Amino acid sequence: MPRLRRAEQVARNRDLLLAAARRVFLARGYAGASLEAIAEDAGFSSGVVYSQFGSKADMFFALLERRIEDRASQNERIAAEFAGADGLRELMRVAQEDAAAEPGWPYLLAEFRAIAMRDGELNRRYAEAHARTVDGIASVLESLYKPIGLEPPVPVRSMAEFVQAGAVGIALERAANPDALPDRDVEQLLLRALGLLDTAVASSGGGRRR
């Protein structure tokens, strides 16, 4: 196998480090994780880690940004195919699959948010990342209304903030009570809150874009 060019090697190392960071952060939490533990998980020296990331916070934000981008692309694909209530249901279905695959992510995010609240610079950086998340959700929600000729009952930005806050809150509630807020109830609550209940389509695929 030919040797990787330096730029390719740097990119490969970064991917491996971020994969290791995800594992360590999810297993130990933000406070319990360290760059040394992440380096060990990835099979690298600490020097390789510090050549890519200046701090644990830098690594966390890189991981968060990648997650934001991945989820935004995923949601955009769904919104391009579905509209109305069916679009919301499909977004929820995929979000539930993601949550099942990484059940610790909402707890990690909540932990980091609590830490960032007490650190002005961390809070500023987190607020910027959070705003991009909300912007992406707002854009996708807006696209659910246009094909069915409806106007959102409240500004889509407020809807997006409500949805994002609810997702983290539901995860935390279920940590204390796994039976809290069944998915079917959450679906009905969101359909009502977003003014999409009357657009619910009984037939399979009825909400696909034509």
Please tell me what each predicted stretch does:
Residues N123-A127, Y145-R210:
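Hydrophobic/aromatic-rich alpha-helical bundle segments in the mid-to-C-terminal region
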Residues A72, R77, A101-Y107, G120-P147, ...:
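Amphipathic alpha-helical packing segments from all-alpha helical-bundle domains
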Residues L16, A20-D58, A62:
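Helix-turn-helix
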Residues A62, S73-P106, P152, V156-V163, ...:
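Hydrophobic alpha-helical connector segments
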Residues V10-A21, I38, L63-R67, R71, ...:
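Generic hydrophobic, amphipathic alpha-helix propensity
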Residues A20-R28, Q74-R77, L108, F112, ...:
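Solvent-exposed, amphipathic alpha-helical segments
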Residues M1-L16, G54, D58, A62, ...:
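Residues at secondary-structure transition points
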Residues S55, I115-G120:
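Short loop-to-helix capping motifs
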